[in-house]
Amino acid sequence: MSTSSEIIQHSDGRVELKPEAYDEISKSPLFNHDLAPVKVADRNWTTYNFAALWISMAHCIPTYMLSSGLISAGMNWWQALITILLGNTIVLAPILLNSHPGTKYGIPFPVFARAAYGTYGSNLPALMRAIVACGWFGIQAWIGGEALNTLFAAIIPGWKTLLGGPIGGHMGTEWLSFLIFWGLNIFIIYRGMDLLRKVENWAAPFVLVMTALLLAWAIWKANGLGYLLTQQSKFQTVGEFWKIFIPSLTAMIGFWATLSLNMPDFTRFGHSQKEQAVGQVVALPTTMTVFAAMGVMITSAAVVIYPHMKAEELWDPMKLVGQFQQVWVIAISMFTVVVATLAVNIAANVVSPANDFANAFPKLISFRTGGLITGIIGILMQPWRLLADPSGYIFTWLVGYSGGLASIAGVLITDYWLVRNTDLKLGDLYRTRGTYRYGAGWNWRAVIATLVGCAIAWAGPILARIGIVVPLLQILYDYAWFVGFGVSAGTYFLLMMLAPARTAGEVQSS
């Protein structure tokens, strides 16, 4: 069992294992080097690194297009931006709360989850999170492939028909571009986390500068910002607005609900709690709102510049840039999109599921193998279908999974901050018979709390599919993230108080 004598407690609160304890747990079936606690000497991410991480992740095409779904639902431009800002400010709270154990103990998300769910039960939240990340990986890979396809079409004569006609609704060269971009992601995964940090550091300012230049060009070309900024909201009453605002806010929270769980995958490399927290607070809500605002302004100007284009095409930067006549402009723009999409895809959608799959089979699956599995599942989830319907993307995909991930976040935050008061036995997180074994490696309290949270958050649409309409449950689905988080947190805390785990005693139970 883990003891205080096997750890080194640093003055800034960070904890690491003594060399002999590290050597001992390295023989455990729950250990591999990708899941190992990071030594304090190797925790070197600064405020800039965390800010750059969020800036590069926020500068992606889905962020650029976020406002489009909200405006098409009836909001005006400032209502859409306030919704985005508020959603990202709210999700910052669970992100910071779950970031703390990463920096304090140097552990990734799947290992952190062992404290609440058990050494084997942690696979439940890890794999739930991984499947969502695989879907996001596929979406970003498809977007990156579209950017490459636009780039190739501009510089290679006859590119669009190079492989013949449409296959499965898309040209053969579209599929080829998708696979090339997919391969670029896998290449960076195999080069490791240090290359990722370098990519994030220079991708963040590069993408922001290029988008600002595109905005300046659009304003100059259109002699202003166009009509979108004077367009009125379609809602006549507060009640009408509220019906759209709540599910929209839930969707905005859901946009980064994945990272609200797995930020320990990054904060484990943090130089201090202050540096990781400041970097995230400064970068996340501001960057998301500013980049979405840029999308609104560029699209508004584009309405004037390209009046022949359909409304949905104007919100797609790939189709918009495809209208340019200058090859060099298209090349620079699409290179920017490729860099931005690579940065966000690997950081947001590969690091966590790769660790999650490694956690399920530590001795069989490495981080690299987990990344490859993520890429394959991302293709199988058919991202081109998820992106085909903008309203479905926001109100089904984002809202839907937010309830499930919030149910996990509620358990993790309650366990770490309320039940354990941030005190974890680091060595036991890697031991099959340590404190977190519970019953056969599963903490049934955490599992029940998660399932109850998911059930209440998802009950409305699930019952509606079989013809049972319960108005209250339909309303609760609009609040899916809040419902999942609140119900799971309350249920878990209640169960831990009424039937507390016996820790060491339960570990040795027969």
Where are these predicted regions, by residue range?
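Hydrophobic, membrane-embedded alpha-helices of multi-pass small-molecule transporters
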Residues: 47-64, 177-184, 190, 216-222, ...
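Selective recognition of specific alpha-helical transmembrane segments in multi-pass small-molecule
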Residues: 59-63, 86-94, 128-140, 205-221, ...
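Membrane-interface "cap" regions at the ends of multi-pass membrane proteins
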Residues: 2-77, 92, 221-225, 235-247, ...
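Juxtamembrane transmembrane-helix boundary signature
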Residues: 84-117, 129-132, 136-142, 301-302, ...
